[in-house]
Amino acid sequence: MKLLYTDIRTSLTEILTREAEELVAAGKRVFYIAPNSLSFEKERAVLEYLSQQASFSITVTRFAQMARYLVLNDLPAKTTLDDIGLGLAFYKCLAELDPKDLRVYGAIKQDPQLIQQLIELYHEMTKSQMSFLDLENLTDEDKRADLLLIFEKVTAYLNQGQLAQGSQLSHLIEAIENDKVSSDFNQIALVIDGFTRFSAEEERVVDLLHGKGVEIVIGAYASKKAYTSPFSEGNLYQASVKFLHHLASKYQTPAQDCSQTHEKMDSFDKASRLLESSYDFSELALDVDEKDRENLQIWSCLTQKEELELVARSIRQKLHENSDLSYKHFRILLGDVASYQLSLKTIFDQYQIPFYLGRSEAMAHHPLTQFVESILALKRYRFRQEDLINLLRTDLYTDLSQSDIDAFEQYIRYLGINGLPAFQQTFTKSHHGKFNLERLNVLRLRILAPLETLFASRKQKAENLLQKWSVFLKEGAVTKQLQDLTTTLEAVEQERQTEVWKAFCHVLEQFATVFAGSQVSLEDFLALLHSGMSLSQYRTIPATVDTVLVQSYDLIAPLTADFVYAIGLTQDNLPKISQNTSLLTDEERQNLNQTTEEGVQLLIASSENLKKNRYTMLSLVNSARKQLFLSAPSLFNESESKESAYLQELIHFGFRRREKRMNHKGLSKEDMGSYHSLLSSLVAYHQQGEMSDTEQDLTFVKVLSRVIGKKLDLQGLENPAIPTSPSSKTLTKDTLQALYPAKQEFYLSTSGLTEFYLNEYSYFLRYVLGLQEELRLRPDARSHGNFLHRIFERALQLPNEDSFDQRLEQAIQETSQEREFEAIYQESLEAQFTKEVLLDVARTTGHILRHNPAIETIKEEANFGGKDQAFIQLDNGRSVFVRGKVDRIDRLKANGAIGVVDYKSSLTQFQFPHFFNGLNSQLPTYLAALKREGEQNFFGAMYLEMAEPVQSLMAVKSLAGAVVEASKSMKYQGLFLEKESSYLGEFYNKNKANQLTDEEFQLLLDYNAYLYKKAAEKILAGRFAINPYTENGRSIAPYVQQHQAITGFEANYHLGQARFLEKLDLADGKRLVGEKLKQAWLEKIREELNR
């Protein structure tokens, strides 16, 4: 046994490689052992340090892989399970347990998280050399009973199925202990690099091999000052020093100091010594100069995105300045990998920097996992429509084209069907021939056939079920789709998809191993498959060695790369505080460690945090050979964050914090990193809306624009202006002539007018391009309205011989039997319930019609407008026609005055502010249209709410009071002529604010015509601005902004181009109500018309 240590600025790997070469020269076969996270890097470093750059006698490996290189005899042939197989075994065993048998975990026995925690505990106990029977020492009776029962069940199952238990290392330990290793131990040597602690399992291997006479060399980083100090607690080197002291004491071998004398103390050595002295409370006077501050820089950035952009620019700049540098000379360390992963790819692709993030990717979000999840949902929830759509959207099931899938999805959404029997019925319903039923039925059979065959599978042996699954994958064209998908991808993506398929097949292999000979139902198989795939991970390797390696900062080793950028070093990320999320608490771990034999030790993360984090910080400070950049953003994951305390210490020693910002207001030579990044910088520069006033900057932009313009012209491309906000183009004359020929009538409806004033571009989408909402066979607000309209139309047309209630019931019965409504409201139990609610509404609304003797209905569903009478005349002489339909026309019996009624499903009132801004023209339009048809005598225009009044019983003193309050809401709301109001009864809300004189009435009609004229002129000119209106000047209502995905309008960026509603200019902040408010708006209307 030989123990070595060296100072942190001397390469330990180089020293240990020399030791390995000496052992090879002595005839030994050397196993160079590195930690799992560093094994690939160590292999490359060892090869670089070898005098001949290669050796057949040195194998760089990990502890777990050593068994592969040793000859093990007479070991029983057992199948080894990995985490996926182990998870399936736990799932199977827990499924067989009755929830009542488990006191703590019964309710969550098949929860994926619990299974994951059980797997972790299984591995942890194996590594710590602890038997599951040691759990008898747990003090919590319920937990002890549950864990013992679970592990006994799993262990018995693994033994029964001849499945290997434990890790590869535990098998090696067993083989050495039982003399089952035929390799000559005298010819073997171990060199161990990069460890600051051994697990109980690793220490047992070292102990056994040492006992067999294997030469072992172990090296670690430590300063002589730290190693010889009698007190190491709190020291930066505490982890490595305690490790060396423990081994020295155990094997009676003092550690040798292999530190080298450096001619000059570099910046990183200086920072290390200052940090060490601050933690061991010794005094040290070292000056930090400008060169040190240049070599070790501390950046303070605003956001994570800005950090990455600055790093990318810095790398590009260094590559530009020094042609000898390549990407492999750079290393990026992340404070939190998950938070940077997405932005990293976006920004580094933009700057054309190849990188490799050495991290396994989860399969949870891959389409193949979603494919299995969708089939499981179809089986479990009995063929829901949404699950079938999700299955088709994976693009892995069937070889249908995207247009076929879209057509099928649109049709089944139209039908609103759920359940396999509904899908098995031939599609026969169509909407005025809109759907190609013949083609849809062909698609239906193609989609259903493989699923029907699979879902017919009963509980059977796992082998048979896997055969049926294989047939399903072929019939459903899943394998073909995956092949087609990969052929169109780049090489890197093809490799990624290959790894995913391997992982998928591996889950199936593990399932076959675990459930060999067992009876399994299809739903359980799919659940297990999905669970296994969710746990699966895959990893790709970089296509080339020359890439920027990216990793978590806590996996770094000293002297790793020439230039190191460590970003995201906030207080939350540095240091990392390991949390115990396992099934055993720290107290329980401590108790188990005390009650079990020596050499059996569970890790207690909280006790390791301090010494581990200090050693990690030391490694981080010494990770670079030439230049180190430490950065912390002010905003991390959209929350305010502070820089790490370790960075503050370095600043205290004399290193300077540099405020770094991306400056889009100016362009510099640093922007010339790559073509894509330059283009991005140019876009950002334009989007600032500000141009630098300096002549030099303006000249640079002009020249740059000309160069890019010439390059684009050579390739036959256009150089478009960079838009700063969404905008629309005016329609060409040819288009306008095709849309609105001069000899053809131009029609505008009241709903079209409202849409235009909501957002001009919405009018263009709906009334010019004909954008339609998705069709639904199920009842919706439109069908509800038509149903109620039809009932009242029929009830009022029936002869007056019978009472109103009898006529209403007859109308309800006849309308319900109409083919259109019968199809809708008999479709499902939900639709039938909706119909009953609507009938209650009809009977309630009938109360107003039943007790209103002052009026008589003369027309229902009355059409108005047409070619005979133009609504308005434009300045160019062109006529505008308005057409529509009035729900009902009433007549006063007293003097024959006419009134119009529009049915509404909710409370609607006429509002002067909305009318002035073009958003409430319905009632004035109806009156104007009837006036143009010859009617002169009106009593008003109103809305009638068709709804059951809801009254809070808490707000009234008695039930009688509730009836009175409810009846107040059941009134006609709208506009009434003052001279006719005396003839109207209690069912009309005729307060002063709603009453108009003849002059005011005409004023409203004139302004309404003015609104139509303004809209018609813009429409006929082909100008449709993207200008949704805003009422409060701060946001856009959702119903106004319905086409955001098309227009790209975002209120937080583009509110300036929204249409701000006109408001009253009130002095002294007065608030007007009632009659005064009406008069104020009428005065504003007069002013607008007189302009």
Curated annotation (Swiss-Prot):
SUPFAM superfamilies: P-loop containing nucleoside triphosphate hydrolases, Restriction endonuclease-like. Its cofactor is Mg(2+). InterPro entries: ADDB_N, DNA_helicase_suRexB, P-loop_NTPase, PDDEXK_AddAB-type, Restrct_endonuc-II-like. It is an enzyme of class 3 (hydrolase). Keywords: ATP-binding, DNA damage, DNA repair, DNA-binding, Exonuclease, Helicase, Hydrolase, Nuclease, Nucleotide-binding. Its EC number is 3.1.-.-. The keyword Repeat does not apply. The keyword Nuclease applies. GO terms for molecular function: 5'-3' exonuclease activity; ATP binding; double-stranded DNA binding; helicase activity; hydrolase activity, acting on acid anhydrides. One of its GO terms (biological process) is double-strand break repair via homologous recombination. Belongs to the helicase family. AddB/RexB type 2 subfamily. PANTHER family: RECBCD ENZYME SUBUNIT RECC. Heterodimer of AddA and RexB. NCBIfam families: rexB_recomb (TIGR02774). Despite having helicase-like domains, this subunit does not have helicase activity. The heterodimer acts as both an ATP-dependent DNA helicase and an ATP-dependent, dual-direction single-stranded exonuclease. Recognizes the chi site generating a DNA molecule suitable for the initiation of homologous recombination. This subunit has 5' -> 3' nuclease activity but not helicase activity. This is ATP-dependent helicase/deoxyribonuclease subunit B. It comes from Streptococcus pneumoniae (strain Hungary19A-6).
